[in-house]
Amino acid sequence: LQLMWRVLEKIKSENKTIKPLHVITTDTLVENPIVALWVNTSLDLLREKAQNEGLPIFPKLLTPNIQETFWVNLIGRGYPAPNTKFRWCTERMKIRPSDRFLRKLSAESGEAVLVVGTRKAESSNRAQSIAKFEKEATRENFNPHVNLSNVSSFLPIKDWSNDDVWLYLLQEKSPWGINNKDLLTMYQGATDGGECPLVVDTSTPSCGDSRFGCWVCTLVKQDKSMSAMVQNDSEKTWMEPLLQLRNNLNEKDHEKRDFRRLTGNVQLMPNDDEKSVPGPYLKKTREDWLEQLLKAQMKIRENKQLPEEIKNIQLISQEELDEIRNIWFYDKIEIDDSLPTICEKFAKGEYHFESLEDNHIFDFEILKILKDTCKDDEMIFEIAKGLLEVERKHFKSARRTGLFDEFENIFKKSFYKDRTDAIDYAKEKKKIKIAAEKQLPLTGTE
């Protein structure tokens, strides 16, 4: 970014036309709080200085759509914590926000060039990715964008080492006034041991080799950067609740998840017909994650070492909670509407919710009677409340289009007796499918 600033300064000094530079960064809403604070401060200074200097530089902080945030998907829909086999977070929270912005910008301007600070030295995967795009370059140093045909990517520092980056940043002051030494200190604090040694050969670790990411990231075994921050600086121990919650998310969770997929289907494990592929988090688990999140928020705010700038840190927004509540109540037909009660218990007065009384088919006492009538059989209870909720939804409709399809979907999802019955049913379906493919006669129980 500093290099691009200097380029625009030179173009301006030569009285040439300067094309606008949009500085975009994506806030996933679960960024490391220290990093998020530094980024926001830098963008504010950048915006002010660019205006004063008459440079067409426009900082833009992008965020995911409310339906695609981490907590709406995990607590709301019950998506399990991301892993290498189900990495649902990156596309929704990082790629789509920038793609939407670039698509809009390129449509308005005809084309756009995306200048990225990606470097080969970051990782072997990054080096392979850059090498691949270099082969596909339409012109020297310009690569086609993966998703957008009228956007090109330019990587000006792709061959720089970590030391090259730090040497430049410490020798060249930031034009917009952010202190690069503060950035060095932040990386130093996130490095194991808290040291930035003088690099004398390739065996010496470089400063800033740590990578900052989302504090909830479970794609790695350990959040080394945040752990190092807490370990190296006693004033950052307030982040410990974040580390603890992140570690809880990373624990084995099969018992916390439904034996059915979101669609209600039961899928057997590839190498074990006695187990089903776990589906979304169970209702109790989702409620527990919300409780843990609000407790962490409360504990952080109570810490006297919390920086003044983030004393009112909010780990989940009102908008996210409203979306989660709608998913629980309308999509999952969890008509006990437990979210406001949980929020009031663990974040009293922090969040406010409109009444859903007009949408309730029963009050909670009647709901309890219904559950008692089902003799605590969760499958029967699911069917009963599901059918009644569908009927409520269509009650005032002159035409009840889709009513019977919704009834059928309720039965398809919950007609099993229990987990064992569901697995037996899936095994029988698999057996029938194999027999049909082989055109063999069926044998077995009726």
Model regions: which residues?
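Nucleotide-activated chemistry modules centered on ATP-dependent adenylation/adenylyltransferase
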Residues: 1-446
